[in-house]
Each structure stands twice: as structure tokens, then as C-alpha cells.
Design a protein with these regions (language model features):
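Hydrophobic alpha-helical segments at protein termini of multi-pass membrane proteins
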Residues: 1-363
């Protein structure tokens, strides 16, 4: 398994060298990759300003129908779109294996693909809810601890988790027909992945791809696990409203709080030395998701383990990111920028390997 990892990383290094030489030879690295030079950037800023003006004026119907052009404008840039799609596909393959999908004709596969598509669409109501809450409740990003937490819990966590869960709801009747907690959780997780995919396009667009490795091991699985747990609770509530209704509300509230605390701990300066709270929230959500996964998966012998699939996906994204950044910034700059990320993300990889159903580590 580790030979596979090193082989993939070696291919990525050679790919980065090739990208660097093509860049040096005048391959036009920044024609389509650099965000600052993207054609139509000014038009996008004008669209955002018009949208904000509509929201300030309370024209919410116009805001709703104008949102897609703004929310999905970065998708037109092919390079960050391709990198974000590649990362999303790697995690989606992991989810399909975790859900024990048996083939192309398996209904579980199509439920999860539908969930991914609904997650992509959830970016639309997310922006709408966020803009509405900010104006309705007077939410503003703040450097102060209490106001900062309030903004990220109510203004970020609530609209994002609410929109993802709302887009999961249309799939519940199909899940009740198929029946199964495992596929319900993994379909909801796919909704989270779809959201993360669209969100990642914007982040990669603005960072020349430097955030790809970090977000592959943080944002992607965080959205996946948050929505997976909330969706599983909602599915159980739909199946047994009296028994699971209150618990579904509790789980949703906890996911919103965990999301908000994680973001606030990263951004709000007042957290200071207590910023570790965000990583604790992340670890607890991931732990609970994989605990459910271990309990729900039926024992089976697989030619490729989930751990191997995870390591392969992580290695492939690292290799692709290295080549991408080498094309953008040059080989040496890619080495300098990504070396620290690889070391810091090794702890995240350890966390996932430890929680896998067929765990490779025990400490």
C-alpha cells in the first residue's frame, strides 16, 4: 500500500517538473489559471454589488433569481474547476465504497450521485439564507469572541447546514423505499461533498491551488460528515417521527454549532490559544461519523480496503496539486509552499486512518 502512495507522489513530482518546464517554455501558465487575469472579473464584482443592493433594499425575490449567476460564476474557470472536481471524485469514490455499492446498476450509486448533484445546488439557498440572516439579525464578522462566534454559528453554520439538509429532503422518499441507515447516511454525506466541491472552486481560484491539499483533508470530509450525521438523523426521524424527531433537531443543532465553532476558531483572533477548540469540534464530528459507519457496514471481504482508497485519493490529490501549483508558480515555489502543508496534514491523515472500519493504526 505504501509503495502505491510513494509511486503516486513520485509521478506528481515528475508532473510538477514537466509543468514547470512547459511554463518556462512560454506555455502561458497564467492565461486561464490566474484569478487576477480572468476575463469578466469586473463583471462579477458588479453583479455582487447589484445583488447586495437588492438585498439591502429587501427585494428578496429578485435576490433569489439573481443569485445563481453570482454563486456559480467561478465554475467557468476550468483549471480550479478541474482540480476541485478531481478532489470531489476521490472522496465520492470513497463514499461509494463505504456504502458498499456493488455496481453501476445498484440504486445506491444513483442515490449518491443524486445527493452530490443536490449538494452542488445547495450553494444557491446557502447564499440566500446567509444574506437574509445577516440583514435580519444584523450579523457582521467580528474580531470579538462572542460576536465572532455568533456570526459564524448563525451566519455561516446555520445557513450552510440548513441548505444542505433542505436539499437532502427530496431524496428521503427514495431512501425510505430503498431502506437502510447506511445508504441514508452516505447519500447525505454526498450532499455535503457536492457543496464542498462548489465551494472549493472558489477557494482554489483565489489561492492558485495552494489550499487543495488542506481542504481535501478538512473542508471536504467536514462537510461530508456534518451533513451525513444530520441527514441520517433526519432520515430516522422520517421513519419514526416520535422516536427520532427530537433527536434529529438536537443533532442538527450540534452540527450547526460544530461548524460555526470550527470556522470561528480559525478566523476570530480573540480565540487565541483556545483555537484548538475548532479542531476538537472537527475531530468529534469525524469520530462520530466513522463510529456510525463501522456499526452500519456489514462485514465483507473487499479486494481494496477503505484505508487504501483513502490513501490513494489523498496521494492523487497531492500529486495533482503539486503539478497544478508548479504550472502556476514554478517548481521551487510549489516545493516551498506545499512542503509545510504536507507535514501539517499528516496529522489529519492519521486521524482518518485511525477511524477507518479496518483501522491501520491503534494509537
Amino acid at each position: 500500500m505504501w509503495q502505491m502512495v510513494f509511486a503516486i507522489l513520485a509521478v506528481g513530482i515528475f508532473g510538477g517538473m514537466a509543468a514547470h518546464f512547459l511554463r518556462s517554455a512560454g506555455g502561458g501558465a497564467n492565461i486561464v489559471l490566474a484569478p487576477a487575469e480572468e476575463e469578466g472579473a469586473g463583471d462579477g464584482e458588479d453583479a455582487v454589488e447589484k445583488l447586495e443592493a437588492l438585498a439591502d433594499g429587501g427585494s428578496w425575490r429578485e435576490v433569489w433569481w439573481a443569485l445563481p449567476a453570482v454563486a456559480f460564476q467561478r465554475v467557468r474557470n476550468p483549471a480550479p474547476l478541474a482540480l476541485a472536481a478531481f478532489a470531489g471524485i476521490c472522496w465520492l469514490i470513497f463514499c461509494c465504497q463505504a456504502a458498499q455499492v456493488r455496481g453501476v446498476r445498484d440504486a445506491k450509486l444513483w442515490l449518491m450521485l443524486g445527493g452530490f448533484a443536490m449538494g452542488c445546488l445547495s450553494i444557491w439557498p446557502t447564499h440566500f439564507f446567509s444574506m437574509w440572516l445577516e440583514r435580519r439579525l444584523g450579523l457582521e464578522e467580528s474580531a470579538e469572541l462572542v460576536e465572532g462566534i455568533r456570526f459564524f454559528v448563525v451566519g455561516v453554520g446555520l445557513p450552510e447546514e440548513g441548505a444542505k439538509l433542505l436539499c437532502f429532503v427530496p431524496l428521503i422518499p427514495l431512501l425510505l423505499w430503498v431502506r437502510g441507515d447506511l445508504i441514508a447516511m452516505m447519500t447525505a454525506a454526498s450532499v455535503g461533498l457536492g457543496f464542498a466541491f462548489i465551494e472549493n472552486v472558489t477557494y482554489f481560484h483565489g489561492s492558485s491551488g495552494l489550499e487543495a491539499v488542506g481542504r481535501y483533508l478538512t473542508a471536504n470530509p467536514f462537510h461530508m460528515t456534518l451533513t451525513g450525521l444530520a441527514g441520517l438523523a433526519l432520515y430516522r426521524a422520517a421513519r419514526d417521527p416520535k422516536g427520532w424527531g427530537p433527536q434529529a433537531l438536537l443533532v442538527f443543532g450540534l452540527m450547526v454549532a460544530a461548524h460555526g465553532l470550527y470556522d470561528a476558531a480559525i478566523v476570530v483572533p480573540a480565540f487565541g490559544e483556545f483555537s484548538l477548540v475548532g479542531m476538537i469540534a472537527f475531530a468529534l464530528v469525524v469520530y462520530q461519523f466513522f463510529r456510525e459507519l463501522r456499526d452500519l457496514r456489514s462485514p465483507s471481504s473487499e479486494p481494496v480496503s477503505l484505508s487504501a482508497t483513502f490513501l490513494a485519493g489523498t496521494s492523487l490529490v497531492m500529486a495533482a496539486t503539486f503539478a497544478y501549483v508548479s504550472w502556476q508558480l514554478g517548481f521551487q515555489a510549489a516545493c516551498d509552499a506545499l512542503a509545510g502543508q504536507v507535514l501539517s496534514m499528516s496529522l489529519m491523515a492519521y486521524l482518518f486512518l485511525r477511524e477507518m472500519p479496518e483501522t491501520m493504526v491503534t494509537v
